[in-house]
């Protein structure tokens, strides 16, 4: 019997999370990014200011020394299996599940250049 080669999951950057030191700095940076890239009005939440859907400018203690990168994939569980085969570990406490019980969000236990990474659908 021949083994079928598993297809490599596809990824795309869903958004970039950028850490700042204060809500004021977060808002200022989100306004600049939004104006520069014509991303529309800044959307403020209790922990971040969003410049469109591309930049989540965090105003509180957030993961990663500099922030995080959200990687979107069609099947988070398949992507996890693919990465686990390469030795990547995941923060089990960060797992979120969809209405069917499948994992739809998880942080990697990996920080590169000050950025943490998470998978999402």
Feature names for model-found ranges:
Residues 22, 73-75, 110-112:
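Non-catalytic surface loops within mature trypsin-like serine protease
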Residues 2-9, 35-42, 53-59, 84-121:
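Vicinal oxygen chelate
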Residues 46-48, 67, 102-106:
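Short beta-strand micro-motifs in enzyme catalytic cores
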